[in-house]
């Protein structure tokens, strides 16, 4: 199984999480699995698989248990606390020259990774760029393959005749073994086989988008000054439009240089111009601009961009691609240059939103400064038994509360008595009677819906027992500290 990589040769790390819910900041991971391959998808190592049990301030979404079949009690028996779980993943991801790839990982799995690292004093970002690392998302490549070069792949459709990009549907339609969907290891194997299929059937497309996955390479496709249109493949445009459009890059965002402000040339540009001429800038919302055709492309999220020449003559009817009309619209934008500055200024509003008071939701408020980064590294290298001795002068106000939660969630026994009381009170406040009543009602409702399904009934019954056990545990901790 083991293959030896040449120095500086790219390797792929295919990975997937199963989680206890769909919120990437507030919900918790249940399982991580990864498989490392060489550039030709030959497996180089045994799969890595880790489980993580939830902390005392959290209960899983019952619906997630029914999807994955992973109960919190199972993770308590076979898994780690979130710090140990995160550290193991960190060690896997940081291997040099790794392209970290999954299926919908840019929007989901990578966000889970960032958030667990943020909560556990590991750098949330360096895993994706340090040591010549990068990331990529096969789901976006699959969408591009369907839109631009669909031959050679069997495409599942829904009842409306629209393409479905669910991993389990694609594997079934293309006779790819996928023995246990929503088990992380099974999903990783299936993703590798799907990548092999696309590379085999459409090698030029695969290699092109692999080459243009990083910001520096993507910037070579963008020429704002010459008003050069490009193809953008994204779920933003919807399946009716083949998840694709021709866009015109306008400018870089004033606040975030990773964001390319563009116009969707499929839309009626006249409407946008009239609207911006007749409505005061103070009354124009970001939603207004999006509805009228403004599109934001995040270059740090591996967007699928390509030159307009990728559309062949035989593709134009299938894609309803009207090159002549797009260039007419570009000329209209040139004549109304005021649009560009107006849009940039309206988009500045998006950065004026109030931040959440919950530190778990504050990962993107700002980057930590050099001083705090050094303290974060120091914490990550400190034994749990020595954490209580640390004297830390954080500059960023988030870190004091993060450090407290980090200790409480992972190493409760090292807390001082007053800290234990504070944590237990926080847990009781989070799992209050109103929340628990609604939570138990949801489980009982699902028990009625799935009364015919023995497996799901057992999962929900086990979860109900877990809820009472957890509340009793937290309640008795509170009694003992009183």
UniProtKB/Swiss-Prot annotation:
Enzyme class, UniProt record, top EC level: hydrolase
Free-text comment on the cofactor: Binds 2 Mg(2+) ions per monomer.
Protein name listed in UniProt: Exodeoxyribonuclease I
Residues bound to Mg(2+) 1: 16
Domain-level remarks: The N-terminal exonuclease domain and the exonuclease C-terminal domain form a central positively charged groove which binds the DNA.
Subunit structure: Monomer. Interacts with ssb (via C-terminus); this interaction stimulates the exonuclease activity by recruiting the enzyme to its substrate.
Catalytic activity: Exonucleolytic cleavage in the 3'- to 5'-direction to yield nucleoside 5'-phosphates
Described function: Degrades single-stranded DNA (ssDNA) in a highly processive manner. Also functions as a DNA deoxyribophosphodiesterase that releases deoxyribose-phosphate moieties following the cleavage of DNA at an apurinic/apyrimidinic (AP) site by either an AP endonuclease or AP lyase.
Site residues by UniProt (Interaction with single-stranded DNA): 114, 125, 129, 143, 215, 258, 300, 364, 367
Keywords: DNA damage, DNA repair, DNA-binding, Exonuclease, Hydrolase, Magnesium, Metal-binding, Nuclease
An MF annotation (GO) of this entry: 3'-5'-RNA exonuclease activity
Domain Exonuclease: 13-194
E.C. no: 3.1.11.1
Named cofactor requirement(s): Mg(2+)
Residue span(s) of domain ExoI SH3-like: 203-351
ExoI C-terminal domain boundaries: 355-471
Residue sites binding Mg(2+) 2 per the record: 18, 187
GO BP: DNA catabolic process; DNA repair
Site (Important for interaction with ssb): 149
Annotated substrate binding sites: 18
PROSITE patterns (UniProt xref): EXOI_C, EXOI_SH3
Site (Important for activity): 182
Top-rank lineage group of the source organism: Bacteria
PANTHER family in the cross-refs: EXODEOXYRIBONUCLEASE I (PTHR11046:SF11), OLIGORIBONUCLEASE, MITOCHONDRIAL (PTHR11046)
InterPro entries assigned: Exodeoxyribonuclease_I (IPR023607), EXOI_C (IPR034748), EXOI_SH3 (IPR034747), EXOI_SH3_sf (IPR038649), Exonuc_1_C (IPR013620), Exonuclease_RNaseT/DNA_pol3 (IPR013520), Oligoribonuclease (IPR022894), RNaseH-like_sf (IPR012337)
């Amino acid at each position: 199984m083991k293959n030896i990589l040449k120095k500086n040769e790219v390797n792929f790390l295919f990975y997937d999480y199963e989680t206890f819910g769909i919120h990437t900041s507030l919900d918790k991971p249940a399982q991580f699995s990864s498989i490392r391959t060489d550039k030709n998808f030959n497996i180089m190592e045994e799969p890595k698989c880790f489980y993580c049990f939830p902390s005392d301030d959290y209960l899983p979404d019952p619906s997630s248990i029914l999807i994955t079949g992973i109960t919190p009690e199972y993770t308590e028996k076979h898994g780690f606390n979130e710090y140990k779980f995160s550290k193991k993943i960190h060690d896997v991801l940081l291997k040099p020259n790794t392209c970290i790839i999954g299926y919908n990982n840019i929007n989901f799995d990578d966000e889970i990774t960032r958030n667990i690292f943020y909560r556990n004093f590991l750098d949330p970002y360096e895993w994706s760029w340090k040591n010549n690392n990068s990331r990529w998302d096969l789901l976006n490549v699959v969408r591009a393959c369907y839109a631009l070069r669909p031959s050679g792949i069997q495409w599942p459709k829904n009842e409306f005749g629209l393409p479905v990009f669910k991993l389990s549907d694609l594997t079934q339609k293309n006779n790819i073994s996928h023995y246990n969907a929503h088990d992380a290891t099974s999903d990783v194997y299936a993703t590798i086989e799907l990548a092999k299929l696309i590379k085999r059937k459409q090698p030029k497309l695969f290699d092109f988008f692999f080459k243009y996955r990083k910001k520096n390479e993507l910037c070579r496709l963008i020429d704002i000054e010459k008003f050069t249109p490009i193809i953008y493949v994204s779920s933003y445009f919807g399946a009716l439009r083949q998840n694709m459009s021709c866009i015109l890059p306008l400018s870089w965002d004033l606040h975030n240089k990773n964001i390319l402000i563009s116009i969707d040339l499929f839309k009626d540009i006249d409407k946008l111009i009239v609207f911006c001429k007749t409505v005061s800038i103070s009354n124009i919302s970001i939603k207004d601009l999006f509805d009228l055709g403004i599109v934001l492309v995040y270059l740090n999220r591996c967007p699928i961009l390509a030159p307009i020449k990728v559309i062949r003559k035989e593709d134009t009817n299938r894609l309803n691609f009207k090159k002549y009309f797009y260039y007419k619209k570009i000329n209209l934008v040139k004549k109304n240059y005021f649009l560009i500055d107006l849009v940039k200024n309206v988009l500045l509003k998006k950065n004026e939103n109030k931040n959440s008071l919950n530190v778990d939701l504050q990962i993107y408020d700002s980057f930590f400064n050099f001083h705090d980064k050094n303290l974060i590294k120091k914490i990550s290298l400190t034994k749990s038994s020595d954490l209580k001795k640390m004297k830390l002068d954080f500059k960023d106000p988030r870190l004091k509360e993060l450090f407290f939660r980090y200790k409480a969630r992972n190493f409760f026994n090292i807390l001082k008595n007053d800290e234990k009381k504070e944590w237990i009170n926080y847990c009781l406040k989070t799992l209050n009677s109103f929340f628990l009543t609604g939570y138990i009602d949801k489980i009982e409702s699902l028990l009625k819906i799935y009364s015919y399904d023995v497996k799901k009934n057992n999962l929900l019954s086990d979860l109900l027992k877990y809820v009472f056990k957890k509340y009793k545990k937290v309640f008795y901790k509170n009694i003992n500290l009183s």
